[in-house]
Every structure is written in C-alpha cells, then in structure tokens.
C-alpha cells in the first residue's frame, strides 16, 4: 500500500470510527518526542516548502518562477514559514522552492513543477503548502498523488476569512484526502485554543494549531507548525505511515467528541 492510500485509509478509519476517539491516549506529542530521542532516525529529514522564497542565505532551494533564479522573499511569507518549521525541527534539512512572489499570485504551473522536483530532486519527506487555490486542479492533484506515492507527507492550510469565503468551504490542496489539512486557532490569555472568524473550518480539516507569527496570523503559520512537528517526529523514528495516527492521538479535542467536520481531531499544542 503506497503512502497516499495509507493516509486516505487512515482518515477513513478514524473518521468512520469517531465514536472511539475517547479511547485514544491524550499524549503530549512534544514530550513523546523527547522520550523517543535515543532512537533517532539515521538520515536527516528533508522538508520542502513551496512558497514566496526565503531571505535566509543558509536556505537551499530554487525558484520555479520564469525569469527569476533568486530565492529573495519580497513579501516575507516564505521566510516566516521557514522560521517556524526550523523552530519545530531544528535538525531538518529545509529547502525553499519559490513558486510565487505574493500570496495573491499563486499560479498552478510553477507549483506543479515544484511538487515533482520536491520528491524527484530533493527527496522530500515532508512538503509544506501554506497557500490555497479556490478551484480544483487535475494537474495539481496528480502532482500531489505522485509526491505521496514517493513517500512524502503533504501538509496544507485550510485557509482564512470564513465570513467572506463561506463557512466550511476549504480550498485546495487541503481539501484532498491525501493532504493533511490544518486550520488556525488563536490563544486566549490563559493560553487556551479559541476558534476565530479569521480562520476557515470544515470537513477537510484534520488538525488545528495556533496561527500567530509576530504581528501576522493565518492558517499558513498553523500549517508550518504542524509541518515542523511532523518533521521532528520523522527525525525521531516515527514512520511516515504512522504520522496521521500519531497526530490524532496527540490532538486535544475541540467541538463534538472525537473527529468532527469542523476541527478534525482538534488542537495540536505546538509552541
């Protein structure tokens, strides 16, 4: 069974047996990672980020924009994503594949090319997609399926602005079964997770995580936190096929008991 089928089936198993969710152990994933530290993976985990570039001179990668070879990030989005992932997985090999100059200029062609390169050239273990497309794309879906078949875990944001976009309307690629969809939450004064009208919630959401990053906020940053957590888990010996189950066991329930169609398995407490 290839990883894409495994992830699809894992989602199906969990969501159709949501009533059993209370039996899952309420593990603090970061503590579990510390306990797993002696059995580290031999190879460094590679995280590919498809985004707006990165202003860190130490970040490897390439640009898929026509006429531009530089990784320079003119909007700062990709740089913040890189930083959050590195905070969560400091030993990971982070690769930036620049696919757009601004969050409003996300085009399919460079993204599709970058997805294939992520697994064929850079051998990505995890791929971070902190952006959305409103319409489904066969070419992009094929690229996602291909990347999953090569063993990559793909993490994407559910999106923002639920009032203007429509409650429960999750954009692509998070809406595909093969992708782990992440929604954002805010933290209140007590450090507890709270939902916000700023974030999208719906059927394609698998997990929620805090969405703040300095003065910015969005499910893009929630996604980066989950990507960092996944990379750290892989680095500590968790198999890619077990990642979804591992995260589900660690999530703090939100909304209806167990898995639900708004918050998925719930909140992952990630710094």
Predicted regions and their residues:
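Bacterial N-terminal signal peptides
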Residues: 25-35
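Sec-dependent signal peptide cleavage junction
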Residues: 37-41
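Active-site core segment of subtilase-fold serine proteases
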Residues: 42-95, 110-113, 117-122, 188, ...
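Extracellular S/T/G-rich loop segment that most often corresponds to the catalytic His/Ser-adjacent loop
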Residues: 43-51, 171-238, 261, 267-270
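Solvent-exposed loop/turn segments at secondary-structure junctions
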Residues: 53-56, 100-104, 132-136, 160-164, ...
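Mature extracellular/periplasmic domains of secretome proteins
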Residues: 83-87, 105-128, 137-155, 165-181, ...
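Short helix-loop-beta-strand segments that form the rim/entrance of peptidase-like active sites
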Residues: 85-103, 110, 239-251
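C-terminal subdomain of the subtilisin-like protease fold in secreted/lumenal serine endopeptidases
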Residues: 125-129, 150, 181, 235-271
